[in-house]
Amino acid sequence: MDELRLKGVESLAIPHNSNGSNGQMFKLVDWAGNQLDDDYAKKRIRNEPIVEITQIKGTSETHPVLSSRDEWAGFEIMPYRVATGALSKPEGSYVREALLNGMALEQKSMTNPYQFGFVGSSDTHSAASQNIESNFTSKLGLLSGTAAQRGSVPQTGLAGEFGYLTMKVAAKLRPSPLGNSSRIRINGDIYSGGSTPTFGASGLAAAWAEENTRESLYSAFRRKEVYATSGPRMQVRFFAGYGFDESMLTAADGVEQAYAGGVSMGGTFSSNHSTGNGLVSERSAPGFIVMASADLESAPLQRLQIVKGWVDKDGTHEDVIDVACAGGAKVNLATNRCPYNGAAVDISDCSINAETGSWHLSALWNDPEFKAEQRAFYYARVIENPTCRWSTWDSIRTGVAPRPDLPATIQERAWSSPIHYLPK
């Protein structure tokens, strides 16, 4: 790509499916086990300014093993290495940890190779996106076009018991380190196993571009003013700056004010960032504006969150802070969590109560733990009310109970690209 760029051909690459990389995607050593050097780090971020955070083969934001205090960390986890039945190592495979590790490298005066933005993708091989739970036919029509093939309902006939016994015999005769789990028995029923049941109906890439042209869209990707959703077409804005006030959330020109006085998703700022009215004191905490609108064909929003990561002398740290709650509820300042809003799903027909959420949420949040000398990143996460997962829709249409080891419901979401704070 660098050679092409010298010839006037501009391009970028978007790494994907890091969750299934077994720690290879964001490792801190090269192929020979040597520590990353600055030349490699610069090449990496120059050519890979954005990464895929969600797609059909699972979501790569974070993992419960890596983010044990994040109640939403287990969203659509595909635990396997890509195209195998072997488990993928979480460390080095998820983007939030990579953001943290990149800051730690930067703390040592090295270029941060992982200061990237986020997009979502589909990665289906069926000539169609698969980002709607109620109309999901999975990745490969020939291999996962039916509910039984997808593993959401039991296999019957020869494909069931006979397929299970055949798999057991094959695994005994020819054991593989990559695993053999094409069938699984649960409560007496035989289901398709492996990674397919863990696939998600995801995702979408969104860009804030000045116009719908190749040049403008590419520029948005290059400056990382992009975000991802797990499928619904939510609209998300995220800004950081100094001197923001709450009137900007409702002002007709609030977005223009935010651009003028700060940086948008994907950007960087520092303690001497100008607001247009001069420099700001190092002790001033920045403000963060989050605005989100729900997809009217999906579910209402439940909460807005800001995910913060930072590095200090003790290492890297992360936190998840609710900043806006549905229905005008207030965040509990002791827990940084919204109260439960009563959203529920009727598993018998997947109906929801749309009155329990909000179709639009916005907030201005000031970081009470901000330290001017401390590197940090911030990104917005938008959480919908619960809705049925695709596997539950399959079970309803087939007339069987939902598969017990799969989540019956999910909370669709969106992620902004991170904004990085860099000390002077």
Write out the residue ranges for each language-model feature.
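C-terminal functional module detector
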Residues: R5-S11, N17-K424
